[in-house]
Amino acid sequence: NWQASGLRLDDPVKISATHIHIGNRFAFSYRDAEPWQPDPITNFNNTTIAAGLAALTEQAHDMAPAEGLATFIFPNSSLTTALPSATTEIAKIKSFVEAGHSNAEDILEPVTALIGLGPGLTPSGDDFLGGIMIALNLLEEVEKCRVLASAVENAASATNDISRAHLNAAARGVGAEPLHATIGDVISNRNHVLKASLERLDAIGHCSGWDALTGVVITLRAWLAE
């Protein structure tokens, strides 16, 4: 219980080269933290990606949470989404990824509808959009990512500071390590290790890992359809 320990809203925060100090009582060290960047993926083969997506659909079906947006990973399933209001907006975002001839104003409506949508400290809609930007970076779809990131920035006042920080990182192609591991397994069709990556992904937030993965899957499918 952080409140019982003396932590209060609006306590002053000071960040040094090795610690984060909060008020006069707490100091969190990151002295031993090491910089990390996801490994680039350079071999994009349509057949391999399609096989990886098929393996994901099979292995993730019984693992994916009912909450959030993970049911969109399984387009032909009888699973019911917990956020049906997202269906139309996700279709619009998918069309943008497939076409790519849009500007930020054209996709601002679906982005605005998704920002702040769903459960979690980083809401499901935010994580979904972050997953799309990460995937676009990996696929070197620079202009599409720039347009989407611009729309996200315009709508980001509807979410919280922590989620905005994650979205900013996603616009640069950076997410949680288990997400990148799962993406690598899918793109390279490493189905023998995919389940282990999914189990680590499952531990991210309320359902944030799955929501971000949904954005990745939507993007990969749209990319294959181009």
Which role does the model predict for each range below?
Residues 136-147, 221-226:
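Short helix-capping/linker segments at secondary-structure and domain boundaries
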Residues 115-123, 169, 199-208:
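A short glycine/serine-rich beta->alpha loop
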Residues 147-157:
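Long, charge-rich alpha-helical interaction segments
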Residues 119-137, 208-220:
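Conserved phosphate/anionic-ligand binding catalytic regions in large, soluble enzymes, centered on
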Residues 1-100, 104-105, 109, 120-125, ...:
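Phosphate/adenylate-binding glycine loop and adjacent helical scaffold
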Residues 178-226:
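Acidic, carboxylate-rich catalytic segments that either coordinate divalent cations
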